[in-house]
Amino acid sequence: MSGHSKWATTKHKKAAIDAKRGKLFAKLIKNIEIAARLGGGDPDGNPSLYDAIYKAKKASMPADNIARAVKRGAGDEDGAANYEDIVYEGYAPAGVGLIIECLTDNRNRAAAEVRSTLTKGNGSLATSGSVSFNFERKGQIVVPSEGVDFDKLFETAAEAGAEDVTDDDEVYTVITGPSDLFTVRKALQDAGFDYDSADQVMQPKNEVELSLEDARKVSKLIDNLDDLDDVQNIYSNWTASDEVMAQLDEE
């Protein structure tokens, strides 16, 4: 893997300054409920729940909200929604591929809103497999770069089985095989590294480099999709030069 992980960096910056805290919390609560439902309510024995709780704490979610979400997911408290996991594939302008992961209690609403948002942004839904063939499941650990020795991080991650570590300016991004995520995350913790998130992600095999104009269109469409209540994660295969990314950051 080479170059900058634009999407990881963009998501990190967005999370740090996200004014839409209510929507962010709703997504994090869904993650906690699903993790507790699938693996039980004890984070020590459920790595997915541990990471979901950790991510919520990093976003300054109140402890009471987290505790209630765990109880609902584990069945110890009423009120948990029956979420369905749905994945849509689509295209953004300039032929950029999108994978849109949803957690919804209303499949028809999710499909209608995703389709409408894509259409308004000059994108379209794609048939199953037509986009996902260009992506592969990976583990991704995002480590704030300030005060961190990159060489030590790289060595620790590699010894634990990581595939790659990239320098994305404000963060270092550790990439693992999907089954190695928790092992590498724990090794980094044991070595004293702080991290922002540890997630399963979809990483593109090939990327499309965009002009400033196309990058604006694609970024706006992704932001609008991310604002949908049912959308949990969006993965894309676009990249851009450092100059274009700098201009986007200024806007």
Swiss-Prot record:
Q: Which UniProt keywords apply?
A: Cytoplasm, DNA-binding, Transcription, Transcription regulation
What Pfam families is this protein classified in?
TACO1_YebC_N (PF20772), Transcrip_reg (PF01709)
Disulfide partners: none
- Provide a GO CC annotation, any one: cytosol
Q: GO molecular function: any one?
A: DNA binding
Per UniProt, subcellular location reads as: Cytoplasm
Q: Name one GO biological process term.
A: regulation of DNA-templated transcription
Tagged with keyword Aminoacyl-tRNA synthetase? no
Task: List the InterPro entries hit by this protein, alphabetically.
Answer: Integrase-like_N, TACO1_YebC-like_2nd/3rd_dom, TACO1_YebC_N, Transcrip_reg_TACO1-like, Transcrip_reg_TACO1-like_dom3, YebC-like
Reply yes or no: does the keyword Oxidoreductase apply: no
Q: Which domain of life is it from?
A: Bacteria
Q: Its family?
A: Belongs to the TACO1 family.
User: Which PANTHER family did the record assign?
Assistant: TRANSCRIPTIONAL REGULATORY PROTEIN YEBC-RELATED, TRANSLATIONAL ACTIVATOR OF CYTOCHROME C OXIDASE 1
NCBIfam families (alphabetical): PRK00110.1, PRK12378.1, YebC/PmpR family DNA-binding transcriptional regulator
Protein name, as recorded: Probable transcriptional regulatory protein Blon_1155/BLIJ_1182
Q: Which organism is this entry from?
A: Bifidobacterium longum subsp. infantis (strain ATCC 15697 / DSM 20088 / JCM 1222 / NCTC 11817 / S12)
Q: Species lineage, top-down?
A: Bacteria, Bacillati, Actinomycetota, Actinomycetes, Bifidobacteriales
